[in-house]
Amino acid sequence: MAQKENAYPWPYGRQTAQPGLNTLPQRVLRKEPVTPSALVLMSRSNAQPTAAPGQKVVENSSGTPNIPKRSFTIDDFEIGRPLGKGKFGNVYLAREKKSHFIVALKVLFKSQIEKEGVEHQLRREIEIQAHLQHPNILRLYNYFYDRRRIYLILEYAPRGELYKELQKSRTFDEQRTATIMEELADALTYCHAKKVIHRDIKPENLLLGLRGELKIADFGWSVHAPSLRRKTMCGTLDYLPPEMIEGRTHNEKVDLWCIGVLCYELLVGNPPFESASHNETYRRIVKVDLKFPPSVPLGAQDFIYKLLKHNPSERLPLAQVSAHPWVRTHSRRVLPPSAPQSVP
């Protein structure tokens, strides 16, 4: 069977992207830079734009010239060292042979995905991530597949997982934590404007770019929900909000809870409700049994308290996350350079 691109690897009906805001949040002054090599990766498709993820991302109306289209195969890439291993496959450093563009190539085994029954989760991850363009969201440039494997062409984040850096340093200081909070709030504002809830924000799902800038990855648990209301249990135990544990309908405010949990973990070194048993963790989350060690500054405590509210409607809105005095005082966010206007 020949390798294909831009048709889903399983017999699901195709869906078009739901309409959303095309502008980025106000604090992001420009889109993530698009290099000529990235344009090549994004534009190779066999169908019309706006159909399925992986198809033409950059429109001709933006001033970029037409690029000849053809499908990718594994032979288009030089495969380098492994970047990570998972239950369903591996991620490799790779280089596209013609453009020499460096990417992360995620190689997934169909047999494992089918065995675990997560075809829909993967399809959702591809469909959502392919339509997101923000400096703090890991890009999915394209994908293709063959009889045994599915290949996702992802942006390469040179500094790897935030989780690994946290393990090395044990905790982060105020400046680094506040910077991550601003980056995360900006990226989630963009996602929520497009009716996308991530639902699984945690250090393992956050990568770091060359300058240490945050990159949200792993949209496997995320959902494109036009109503922004769901009732599915998902996410990571220590990061689950009360409404999900209690089986209540939830909305985009679950991501606000996750920001609060993440901020605590970065400053303290462990999640706020971590306990010896799952039941005890559940109990502490539902009661919002929040305790701070003396090392956490009062400004950070106030920030976390305002996010970790049992009632979702009382949580600090995303717009106020970046505007919180503690974040404004300590954040040192660096925006990416301007994107090129056209391909030479």
UniProtKB/Swiss-Prot annotation:
Phosphothreonine found at: 35, 64, 232
Annotated Gene Ontology cellular component terms: centrosome; chromosome; chromosome passenger complex; chromosome, centromeric region; contractile ring; cytoplasm; germinal vesicle; kinetochore
Primary location class: nucleus
Disordered, as annotated region: 46-65
GO BP terms, alphabetized: cellular response to UV; cleavage furrow formation; midbody abscission; mitotic cytokinesis checkpoint signaling; mitotic sister chromatid biorientation; mitotic spindle midzone assembly; mitotic spindle organization; negative regulation of B cell apoptotic process
Primary role: Serine/threonine-protein kinase component of the chromosomal passenger complex (CPC), a complex that acts as a key regulator of mitosis. The CPC complex has essential functions at the centromere in ensuring correct chromosome alignment and segregation and is required for chromatin-induced microtubule stabilization and spindle assembly. Involved in the bipolar attachment of spindle microtubules to kinetochores and is a key regulator for the onset of cytokinesis during mitosis. Required for central/midzone spindle assembly and cleavage furrow formation.
Record-given protein name: Aurora kinase B
